[in-house]
Curated annotation (Swiss-Prot):
One of its GO terms (molecular function) is protein phosphatase activator activity. It comes from Oryctolagus cuniculus (Rabbit). Keywords: Nucleus, Phosphoprotein. Gene3D superfamilies: Leucine-rich Repeat Variant. It is found in: Nucleus. Pfam families: B56. Residues 34-45 have a biased composition (Basic residues). The keyword Nucleus applies. This is Serine/threonine-protein phosphatase 2A 56 kDa regulatory subunit beta isoform. One of its GO terms (cellular component) is protein phosphatase type 2A complex.
Length: 500
């Protein structure tokens, strides 16, 4: 009887075993972008590896693994692995249907066997297993036909060979998770070259493939201790090329999710290598255009670092202020959400180091004409822990934001924002009424002085304009006086015929 693959076999981001949960994107950015641009239609692509070879041998069904005696099991397993190494053309839906079905049935059987049968993974089958996996998954990814591909709006190019490829990934995953799996044997085949090719597959446009790759790479990182430093190094290279060269790599979110779990397991004190990764890679990642695709995972990694070492807070906040978006309001909302997550875990001793520059930026966000940016900034005062930090440092935070709050409360076009500002001002008044009154008086005096200077400036310009007009009139009068004798002289010359 044919063994079916369980429908729940595809790993998903929140429920992938061994991966730390990542905050949902709506916690960071509660204002989804709605675009009127029509999503581009999905087109079929095929990797170069899956081009059909007309001279390939026709597949015939082999006996079921469960029907053969134990003495013949491993020989039949090797034959089935070789059978599953035959590739088919999935762009032609009707080509070699029998062979495709034979391979699919064999893959289903292998998945079931390696997941439930003990003693099947002996040393001689390891090279056959890795060879079959490599032949199926390692391929040249097709270039995207759309250079302006937007993962949020455009349909990805799905892998046509997924009916077979999914089963190969599922087999690989169960192979790594099997109780009989021996890393000491597998490390001869799962080496640095294998890992590098595995990482290159993260650029696949098919999100189903990237989900499997994420879980598999995490298992490889956990099983092969000797490859851990190499995996981190190659991830660094991918991120740096993404930031400074191409700004295109489809698997950034998945790699960051893996790294979030890895960071969570870092031993203390943190190594210099890990701190440099935060400062030189994670912080500059905030500058790329496609930040919204992976920001939730990136923010999670940053917060994980700060929970490990609070002294990194100042570097992180100043880095965020350095890359703070100037023209993209959607990114501003995401930055504000990440700052709130950081403030949720910040130590009071670290808060005093960044409070002034941070809340000056928050004040600029409050004054934004885009109401979502202003609203997101004002929501800081709804967070009890942040409010307690502000109250303890009211003498610094209040002067940094008071002028902006007072002015925007009089001028902002959105009444919701005005109401929120009134609530914030009321909170400040209750925190420190004396300081609030002093700042109010100082603000009004400053405004009066500004108005006085504006009047003086206006009077000065008005006086200069009057002086210019008088000089202009005086010049015209002098010119008229000089021209009068000449006008009297011209008729006399005409009367004498020009003779002296």
């Amino acid at each position: 009887m044919e063994t079916k693959l369980p429908p729940a076999s595809t790993p998903t981001s929140p429920s992938s075993p061994g991966l730390s949960p990542v905050p949902p994107a709506d916690k960071v950015d509660g204002f989804s972008r709605r675009s009127l641009r029509r999503a581009r239609p999905r087109r079929s692509h095929s990797s170069s590896q899956f081009r059909y070879q007309s001279n390939q041998q026709e597949l015939t069904p082999l006996p079921l693994l469960k029907d053969v005696p134990a003495s013949e099991l491993h020989d039949l397993l090797s034959r089935k692995l070789a059978q599953c190494g035959v590739m088919f053309d999935f762009l032609d839906c009707v080509a070699d249907l029998k062979g495709k079905e034979v391979k699919r049935a064999a893959l289903n059987e292998l998945v079931e066997c390696v997941g439930s049968t003990r003693g099947v993974l002996i040393e001689p089958v390891y090279p056959d297993i890795i060879r079959m996996i490599s032949v199926n998954i390692f391929r040249t990814l097709p270039p995207s036909e759309n250079p302006e591909f937007d993962p949020e709006e455009d349909e990805p190019n799905l892998e046509p060979s997924w009916p077979h490829l999914q089963l190969v990934y599922e087999f690989f995953l169960r192979f790594l998770e099997s109780p009989d799996f021996q890393p000491s044997v597998a490390k001869r085949y799962v080496d640095q070259k294998f890992v590098l090719m595995l990482l290159e597959l993260f650029d696949s446009e098919d999100p189903r493939e990237r989900e499997y790759l994420k879980t598999i790479l995490h298992r490889v990182y956990g099983k092969f201790l000797g490859l851990r430093a190499y995996i981190r190094k190659q991830c660094n290279h991918i991120f740096l090329r993404f930031i400074y060269e191409f700004e295109h790599f489809n698997g950034v979110a998945e790699l960051l999710e893996i790294l979030g779990s890895i960071i969570n397991g870092f031993a203390l004190p943190l190594k210099t290598e890990h701190k440099q990764f935060l400062v030189r890679v994670l912080i500059p990642l905030h500058s790329v255009k496609s930040l919204s695709v992976f920001h939730a995972q990136l923010a999670y990694c940053v917060v994980q670092f700060l929970e490990k070492d609070a002294t990194l807070t100042e570097h992180v906040i100043r880095g965020l202020l350095k890359y703070w978006p100037k023209t993209c309001t959607q990114k501003e909302v995401m930055f504000l959400g990440e700052v709130e997550e950081i403030l949720d875990v910040i130590e009071p001793s670290q808060f005093v180091k960044i409070q002034e520059p941070l809340f000056k930026q928050v004040a600029r966000c409050v004054s934004s004409p885009h109401f979502q940016v202003a609203e997101r900034a004002l929501y800081f005062w709804n967070n009890e822990y942040i409010l307690s930090l502000i109250e303890d440092n009211c003498h610094t935070v209040l002067p940094a934001v008071f002028g902006t709050l007072y002015q925007v409360s009089k001028e902002h076009w959105n009444q919701t924002i005005v109401s929120l500002i009134y609530n914030v001002l009321k909170t400040f008044m209750e925190m420190n009424g004396k300081l609030f009154d002093e700042l109010t008086a100082s603000y009004k005096l400053e405004k009066q002085q500004e108005q006085q200077k504006a009047r003086e400036r206006q009077e000065l310009w008005q006086g200069l304009e009057e002086l210019r007009l008088r000089r202009l009139q005086g010049t015209q009068g002098t010119q008229g006086a000089r021209e009068a004798p000449l006008q009297r002289f011209v008729p006399q010359v005409a009367a004498t015929g020009g003779q002296s």
